[in-house]
Amino acid sequence: MLSRSDLLTLLTINFIVVTKGAERISEVSARFTLDAMPGKQMAIDADLNAGLINQAQAQTRRKDVASEADFYGAMDGASKFVRGDAIAGMMILAINLIGGVCIGIFKYNLSADAAFQQYVLMTIGDGLVAQIPSLLLSTAAAIIVTRVSDNGDIAHDVRNQLLASPSVLYTATGIMFVLAVVPGMPHLPFLLFSALLGFTGWRMSKQPLAAEAEEKSLETLTRTITETSEQQVSWETIPLIEPISLSLGYKLVALVDKAQGNPLTQRIRGVRQVISDGNGVLLPEIRIRENFRLKPSQYAIFINGIKADEADIPADKLMALPSSETYGEIDGVQGNDPAYGMPVTWIQAAQKAKALNMGYQVIDSASVIATHVNKIVRSYIPDLFNYDDITQLHNRLSSTAPRLAEDLSAALNYSQLLKVYRALLTEGVSLRDIVTIATVLVASSTVTKDHILLAADVRLALRRSITHPFVRKQELTVYTLNNELENLLTNVVNQAQQGGKVMLDSVPVDPNMLNQFQSTMPQVKEQMKAAGKDPVLLVPPQLRPLLARYARLFAPGLHVLSYNEVPDELELKIMGALM
């Protein structure tokens, strides 16, 4: 009966006490760990923004948080296996018991008492052999899930706690010795274990505990001093504002995963290359980082540390954009293109072939984000162009025309050049032909230092490249100003210049006239687009800076040219007049 009671005790402890408790603890730990994950991520971002940690340390801490969540999630599932193992052991025990008795009675013709005695004894022996490893497994799982997390590994914690005091080893020594002298027990193994534990306890009692405590105290003090010195505020710890950055919600982070081919990184690199080539200046690197303050499928674009735009897109879907050849409607979530606001449908990846067959343009999430970044960055290029870019631009000029570069540096200082270059970039004029631009600036700087007039002279020299995108078969279709409006604006500009020095793009205008521009300029733009023409407004040279500024405000995409910027070989076709 001793064996039976032992088996029942092991079953009770294993199933009711150990596995039940470990299962409950693992469930609670997993839930609490996952619930606390956003807060931990926000704390890491706060420390990073405050300069308490650097980017590498923040990345390491994020990985630790993710690993902890994965661990407790895995242990939650593992506890189900452990509990299932205990239940399976009980079921196997019952099957062996009932099956053995039945075999003894019906196959071997034993009496019920003899069969019960024989097969119960065999079942208990098998059950003990199976339940002891199961109990050890359950206990190990319980120890892991109930452990308080710190910076040490579990083996280190167990060793420190078991060997924390010699009295623990002395107690174990006494128990081993008592077992060694019990009749019927294996004397030699227990005596050896007793001697080993006693010797270990004796050696530990001889160690200077005071020295160990002093060493730990010194180590703690050193670590505190080191961390304090590393976190002192200095110029190096103050984070610099990044010119361009892209923040991603955690569901979009997979778009920059190396295992998936870095689709977003590749497209952003392409955007930077295209914009740099088109404008003749090197665009700053576009930094991509995760931001747990954003919604899971949200991203935000920052220019010089300020949020320029943001959007929320389904991370696991494709964007189906209707075209002129589209027929029918495809099932999906209706929405708008983040960059241009066009109506689109978000579809599953499995619907891609169907959407293409129906005439839709299918765009993946990485391309959607890259297109949005391209649109935003292009509108901020003048703000991103700075003094260092002038240096790099002039270095390129020096490699092809060193004397011209020297004359340009002598004619205009960096502050004046920055205004001219930014004025050109604001109106979409590329700086690739830096030799022509520098030649004009050197010649015109002897007459004026006004950046608006200097930019106008550069535009005149680059008139063919400026008008080229709008020309169709040597014909340029334009809108002009109504004669009455042109005379009125000319008088306003002349009176402003007589009253003092006024920038041509900042001449004060009557509010009623501004309201008129606000309504008529978009109309001109839409009418020309509806006719399949590029929106172009042709105006007198002295009015072009002012009207170009209003066009950027009221009708982005409406290009304003002056009469003298139209090459002589082109034929003008006047489509209408701006009233």
Curated annotation (Swiss-Prot):
Domain of life: Bacteria
InterPro entries: FHIPEP_1, FHIPEP_3, FHIPEP_4, FHIPEP_CS, T3SS_FHIPEP
Protein's GO biological process: bacterial-type flagellum assembly; protein secretion
One Pfam match: FHIPEP
One cellular component (GO) term of this entry: plasma membrane
Entry-linked PANTHER family: FLAGELLAR BIOSYNTHESIS PROTEIN FLHA-RELATED (PTHR30161:SF1), FLAGELLAR EXPORT PROTEIN, MEMBRANE FLHA SUBUNIT-RELATED (PTHR30161)
Name this polypeptide is given: Putative truncated flagellar export/assembly protein LfhA
Species: Escherichia coli (strain K12)
Annotated gene: lfhA
